[in-house]
Curated annotation (Swiss-Prot):
Binds 1 [4Fe-4S] cluster. The cluster is coordinated with 3 cysteines and an exchangeable S-adenosyl-L-methionine. Residues 69-299 form the Radical SAM core domain. Gene3D superfamilies: 1.10.150.530, Aldolase class I (3.20.20.70). This is Probable dual-specificity RNA methyltransferase RlmN. NCBIfam families: rRNA_mod_RlmN. The active site is at E63 (proton acceptor), C304 (s-methylcysteine intermediate). Its cofactor is [4Fe-4S] cluster. It comes from Desulforudis audaxviator (strain MP104C). One of its GO terms (biological process) is rRNA base methylation. One of its GO terms (cellular component) is cytoplasm. InterPro entries: Aldolase_TIM (IPR013785), Methyltransferase_A (IPR040072), RNA_MTrfase_RlmN (IPR027492), rRNA_lsu_MTrfase_RlmN/Cfr (IPR004383), rSAM (IPR007197). Its EC number is 2.1.1.192. HAMAP family: RNA_methyltr_RlmN (MF_01849). Signal peptide: none annotated.
Length: 318
């Protein structure tokens, strides 16, 4: 049964033809093979990104994204309906948190995208709506299923888990000794600025977060990715780049620079191209590995910080 659900993506018990008919009939009265309904889909102008609006059985909906790369197909999975982290530049926090997604709802996002696109999924990033480590147990169950022999058999190394910095859960994840790529939504090199942009920093400041990241890298042997959204005139100065370089010196890590994507409600703007070049150069001069993310899907609201909670009954109208 697990193989039918997790690998074949069966939509009903009737499809599980190698199970006895009587057993399937009895089971039908006690269980339902869940599936998320595709309410809407939007394709970017470049054709490399598709955003799906998936309806849940309680009337809410989540956004899931397919990204087409030269090296494969990546699905960006949401972990919660809404988010309670309240990052100032992120649309997912608008309207607050409703509930955690069940592990099956995380998995079904991957299957729904595979069905709708007809393309095999090679990578997963837990970077959609919500904070994955605020839904720890369901997130780890999802990882176990998507990497299992009865599932899609994805390599753990092809899964990236993003967090804004829940230190106890990062430490717990490190003890799991999984080969996941940990991505930290950093966005500021000091507590004063990060307290404003990423409010969870007030509970888990950089003095706790950075050692937790170092522990994760040490226990897993995996390089930690530090995501840094560049907000024009806010966190994109050369001085802050030098602070960031000092903060990460000696850590097995990598900085991923992301020019801010439009979220009208946030009031933030993208940095100038010159500010991006200078920020990157300062990090490189400091010996910090750095890359500039090629953003996909900004024109359809599918890029970093743009996914948001919607209600199923209103989604189709939008």
């Amino acid at each position: 049964m697990a193989e039918w659900v997790f690998k074949q993506g069966a939509l009903s018990l009737a499809e599980m033809t190698n199970l006895p008919a009587g057993f399937r009939k009895r089971l039908a009265g006690e269980a339902v093979v869940g599936r998320l309904e595709v309410l809407d889909s939007r394709v970017s102008a470049a054709g490399d990104t598709v955003k799906y609006l998936l309806g849940l059985d309680d009337g809410h909906a989540v956004e899931t994204v397919l990204m087409r790369h030269d090296y494969g197909r990546t699905v960006c999975v949401s972990s919660q309906v809404g988010c309670r982290m309240a990052c100032r530049f992120c649309a997912s926090a608008l309207g607050g948190w409703i509930r955690n997604l069940r592990s099956g709802e995380l998995y079904e996002q991957v299957l729904a995208v595979r069905r709708a696109s007809g393309e095999p999924v090679t990578h997963v990033v837990l970077m959609g709506m919500g904070e994955p480590l605020d839904n720890y147990e369901n997130t780890l169950k999802f990882v176990a299923n998507v990497t299992a022999p009865y599932g899609l058999r994805l390599s753990q190394r092809r899964i990236t888990l993003s967090t804004c910095g829940l230190v106890p859960e990062i430490q717990k994840l490190a003890r799991e000794r999984l080969a996941l790529t940990l991505a930290i939504s950093l966005h500021a090199p000091n507590n004063a600025l990060r307290d404003t942009l990423v409010p969870v920093n007030r509970k888990y400041p950089l003095e706790q977060l950075i050692p937790a990241c170092a522990e994760y890298a040490r226990r897993t042997g995996r390089r930690v990715s530090f995501e840094y959204i560049l907000l024009g005139g806010v966190n994109d100065s050369p001085e802050l780049a030098r602070e960031l370089s000092d903060l990460l010196t000696g850590l097995l890590g990598h900085v991923n620079l992301i020019p801010a994507n439009p979220v009208p409600e946030s009031g933030y703007r993208a940095p100038s191209p010159e500010a991006v070049r200078t920020f990157r150069r300062v990090l490189e001069e400091g010996g910090v590995p750095v890359s500039l993310r090629r953003e996909l899907g900004a024109d359809i609201g599918a890029a970093c910080g743009q996914l948001r909670r919607r209600h199923r009954t209103k989604a189709v109208e939008e």
